[in-house]
């Protein structure tokens, strides 16, 4: 395990308190560049843009915000900002700039003003975690909300009007699932048949697949809760498929997080069954692949830190997303598909963490790590890229270059003679003023 040091960092001002899932990265204004969204317990959403230390704009919500998200939740072809409070208030913000420009050619309808939601609706309270994704394979995105009482609910936006620009609909409840343990993460991954599957983490490094049975329903649209409580319990039990990832669990109640749909390459390389990762508060990390018969464990790593957040991020640029896990003390682990581990230390305690693409500088999205500390600061480490995950040395790098072998042949050095090539490289790097030693025997250390 090697350590890396990222030095490109910006500090953002944030004086509020937040829940772990009230932070995300996404394109809130539909300009193809991602912003940072943070919601606090006072009901304020701060949107940060570029490397400005102060929020680009703020939004006012009702209640304590527990989760925020960015996505096309209304299926209108543009992203909206979603904020959900613990009291059950669902807020939608349209932060796309107006099409009409002012005299200077800038959109100033948003900047400097506190934004009000374009839509607000009350849903069941005690929200904890949120997901905006297509969970049933119909091409439309749904809203999935996890609750503190071990319940998960799925909603869909139902449009009531004809206008494509204005929101004239409402959220309609699709299904309610009852889980055995606390819900800490929601994610979607590709199943063995290539269709999306809704996953929810369960304590003890376990997870459950939630079946979207409304796809089979015909007739009336899905109701919010069903006719009676008794008619819900039996289907709910059938529609939750629990998976234990280990026969030996040290603590079956330990908090667990998961992330799914981990990319395995560009284009056709990323097709097939989805990869997903799990982490626990006692330091267990696993990468798994969902197979048709049984899940396949690709690797398992045990660390001595309390892991509270799990993300995915392509830090090498090869299309393979690495698993990123963060601990409360700022220790961050980046692990690739081959179990190569790189760690990065932030010298402060962390209250919330996220990773993804963010347009911090240079007018483009780059891989970023975002840490919310306890000292009223948010640290954004941008351009967190690595040339490779595995450890290497100069000789191995040079051996991949054809001109290296031709130069050694000119000097009469055998490329397979490692002591001689190392001595030659040492002399070239540290004693270039000395005359070159062409004979292989003269390159060897007399001692």
UniProtKB/Swiss-Prot annotation:
Keywords of the record: Lysosome, Membrane, Phosphoprotein, Repeat
Residues where Phosphoserine is found: 104, 220
Entry's localization field: Lysosome membrane
Gene Ontology terms: biological process: cellular response to amino acid starvation; cellular response to glucose starvation; germinal center B cell differentiation; negative regulation of TORC1 signaling; regulation of TOR signaling
Keyword Membrane belongs to the record: yes
Signal peptide region: none
Cellular component terms per the entry's GO annotation: cytosol; Golgi apparatus; intracellular membrane-bounded organelle; KICSTOR complex; lysosomal membrane; nucleoplasm
Claim: Oxidoreductase is one of the keywords in the record: no
InterPro entries reported for this sequence: Integrin_alpha_N (IPR028994), KICSTOR_ITFG2 (IPR031793), WD40_repeat_dom_sf (IPR036322)
SUPFAM superfamilies: Integrin alpha N-terminal domain, WD40 repeat-like
Per-repeat ranges for FG-GAP: 19-48, 126-155
PANTHER family: INTEGRIN ALPHA REPEAT DOMAIN-CONTAINING, KICSTOR COMPLEX PROTEIN ITFG2
Subunit and partners: Part of the KICSTOR complex composed of KPTN, ITFG2, KICS2 and SZT2. SZT2 probably serves as a link between the other three proteins in the KICSTOR complex and may mediate the direct interaction with the GATOR complex via GATOR1. The KICSTOR complex interacts directly with the GATOR1 complex and most probably indirectly with the GATOR2 complex in an amino acid-independent manner.
Function summary: As part of the KICSTOR complex functions in the amino acid-sensing branch of the TORC1 signaling pathway. Recruits, in an amino acid-independent manner, the GATOR1 complex to the lysosomal membranes and allows its interaction with GATOR2 and the RAG GTPases. Functions upstream of the RAG GTPases and is required to negatively regulate mTORC1 signaling in absence of amino acids. In absence of the KICSTOR complex mTORC1 is constitutively localized to the lysosome and activated. The KICSTOR complex is also probably involved in the regulation of mTORC1 by glucose.
Protein name: KICSTOR complex protein ITFG2
Organism field: Homo sapiens (Human)
